[in-house]
Amino acid sequence: MRLPVLVLCVIGACSNAPKRDDARALPPAPSKPSGAEPMVAIETAQGEVNVTVEVVATRPKIERGLMFREHLPPDAGMLFLMGGETDHTFYMRNTLIPLDMIFITKDMTIAGIVERAEPRTETLRSVGAPSLYVLEVNGGWTAAHQVKSGAKVRFVRVTP
């Protein structure tokens, strides 16, 4: 009795028939941006500039932010959905790269910008005005793209 069961197990393992779980398998993650990523579009005097964003909304993810990251691609950032409009403060503890912080109001206007926040510091940074969202990008990005306070912002594929 053991030999027929063993033979059936070996034949089943060598079969080319699709496995039951194959239909539910997820496709591999794309290695390049697909064009369907969430983005923030910002109005400037030269036209609109776009930032591909990672969106964070939970307290643990907001608190971790971009800590321990050694690199942030150009024109990429992290969008914090803060959950309430107030004068938010950020620090750079365990953040390894300089960042610009763009504070955005509920009416989608830039309330203020902290430029080139120094990495690995605990200095509290804010713009002294209420915001509902904060966008972090590479240090110097806002100056390079001439992004200014008062500019209008819109979200693309982001659900606040």
Residue ranges, per PLM feature:
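Sec-dependent signal peptide recognition
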Residues: 1-7
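Compact, glycine-rich, soluble single-domain proteins
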Residues: 15-160
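C-terminal motif of bacterial Sec signal peptides marking the signal peptidase cleavage site
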Residues: 10-13
